[in-house]
Design a protein with these regions (language model features):
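Glycoside hydrolase catalytic-domain context in secreted enzymes
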Residues: 1-183
Length: 183
């Protein structure tokens, strides 16, 4: 769902173009088609991930209007019209806060304003060392895999992560599995 903003972008071939409405229409159709074949689509990279150079350290500084009209539009369509089952966060920061750690983006915007009820997954390694902070922000699945189980359990035991939050994250993953198995 990324918007092609730089003609020299090395991954522009993965994007649907620079027009937010074209991206939105294409995203919704692609998600519907993929999911009609029993495959869970994963819309990525939420949000404003539009360059490869320094993408792990850069911040996309946006007004709320620009965020919603340009960068969130494709995700909105994938959610409303495509009923996408999974969304991947981006490496970059938005307005100084990394997306994988941002409650404003993952919980308030994505789940609250855009009404996404599927699974939110991190890009590979984007969660860094603060796994409980990522989960508390709204991330359901941290990639790469299962070597973080001990850290999550310890965070719950020490009160750094509530059991309620962890249960909510697991619920989203189980719901994703159930949806896939229905197909």
């Amino acid at each position: 769902m990324d918007i092609a903003r730089d003609p020299l972008g090395g991954r522009n071939y993965e994007m649907y173009g620079e027009d937010p409405e074209l991206v939105a229409q294409t995203a919704a159709a692609f998600v519907r088609g993929m999911q009609s074949a029993g495959i869970a689509a994963c819309a990525k990279h939420f949000l404003a991930n539009n360059q490869e150079t320094n993408r792990n350290t850069t911040s996309s500084n946006l007004s709320k209007r620009v965020m919603m009209e340009l960068y969130a539009r494709g995700f909105e369509a994938a959610i409303e019209d495509g009923h996408v089952l999974c969304i991947m966060s981006a490496y970059n920061a938005v307005n100084g806060e990394f997306t994988s750690y941002s409650k404003k983006l993952l919980t308030d915007l994505l789940r609250g304003e855009l009404h996404f009820d599927g699974a939110i997954v991190s890009d590979w390694g984007a969660a860094g060392q603060n796994k409980e902070g990522t989960l508390a922000a709204g991330m359901d699945l941290i990639q790469p895999g299962p070597n973080d189980m001990t850290a999550c359990k310890q965070a719950v035991q020490e009160g750094r992560l509530s059991e309620e939050v962890l249960n909510d994250r697991v619920t989203h993953i189980l719901q994703l599995i159930v949806e896939i198995m229905k197909s």
